[in-house]
């Protein structure tokens, strides 16, 4: 009865199932299953094989007993649905799931060979024989290996035939290097089927020790120059940087540092030659300077005794008119050098200083240069001399470094202290610790009226409002 139902439903008439309507669209990307000429009994056996496997999916669980008519009807309906979906007995050219030809007998069902995964674990294999005993063998118990695992290799081979390898490289091939530590030498050179993890031409071509690059089109690189660099994580970089070991410091210029004109790119970086410092011992860097950087022998420059005498005379060189005159006179100008006077060269100035640093600071007044900047918040004042900057910083900090030895008054500037001390030693001075006021005699006015010497010793500076004493409780803003 089940075979008759399968033959009736598997007729070439159009099926009402939705899956059969779209079965032709499923079969476009697959090789069509070319069905051999078989009798209606083979078709019935094929459908019976599918029907016997349906209880494994729970379609009709009562079909194992074979006694209930309702179970038989349900199994027949399910077999009809599956046979209609898989084109069991239908049009032989549009099987959507026939991936590979089974290579078995012509009467055997393709579902029994390739898709016997539909078998129930308890059934003995109604689709294995293929002929007509699919429904009767449903009650037999036999040990059966999982068929899905056994069919993996056949399915993969069929998929390789259906989907040939595309010409474009896999997106992971660009970063997957042949020098990966996880790869063995045998795996890279194996002649198996090409897979996505095969090493292709990436951003670094594997090079052999003699510098020959591997072919970019080959998927399996040659094992000759590759196996030597497999066990090193930086094997692909060996030939690129093999010439950098001693070429930059060798006798000849290396090829990678030569410009197209043939000039070495490091010719501008000359070493310090020993001729500039005749009193010092020749350094090994200067001795090897020609061969290391310049490409030729280092020629020592002869320095004039005049410049060496100026450089190592024990003092800094000076270009003031007095020093230039002493150099012009030679030995006769020893008296000028002994005086050590440095005059300003600006016409009409005529100031003379005993130190060259003082002369340089004086020349900044003429040029207007003020290199010393106050870094106090929102100040930014610039000064010509560093001592002026230090004096200015005390106005921000409120520091009074200089104290009077008589009255213990403190001052920010040393010249203010010296003026204050003169008031104690003067004829009209108070002379006592509390006599801070000026005397009526000559020299009674002391120093500057605007500086801090008139203030008490512990008074806060004007720039520190947080140090001001709190107002008295009985006064408010100076008013009673």
From Swiss-Prot:
Say yes or no: keyword Transcription regulation present: yes
- Mention one GO molecular function: zinc ion binding
Question: What are the residue ranges of zinc fingers typed C2H2-type?
Answer: 342-366, 372-396, 402-424
Q: Work out whether the entry's keyword set contains Transcription regulation.
A: yes
Q: What is its main location?
A: nucleus
Per UniProt, the short sequence motif 9aaTAD occupies residue numbers 194-202
Family membership noted in the UniProt record: Belongs to the Sp1 C2H2-type zinc-finger protein family.
Q: What does this protein do?
A: Transcription factor which plays a key role in limb development. Positively regulates FGF8 expression in the apical ectodermal ridge (AER) and contributes to limb outgrowth in embryos.
Protein name as annotated: Transcription factor Sp8
Organism expressing this protein natively: Gallus gallus (Chicken)
Question: What taxonomic classification does the UniProt entry list for its organism?
Answer: Eukaryota, Metazoa, Chordata, Craniata, Vertebrata
This chain is encoded by the gene named SP8
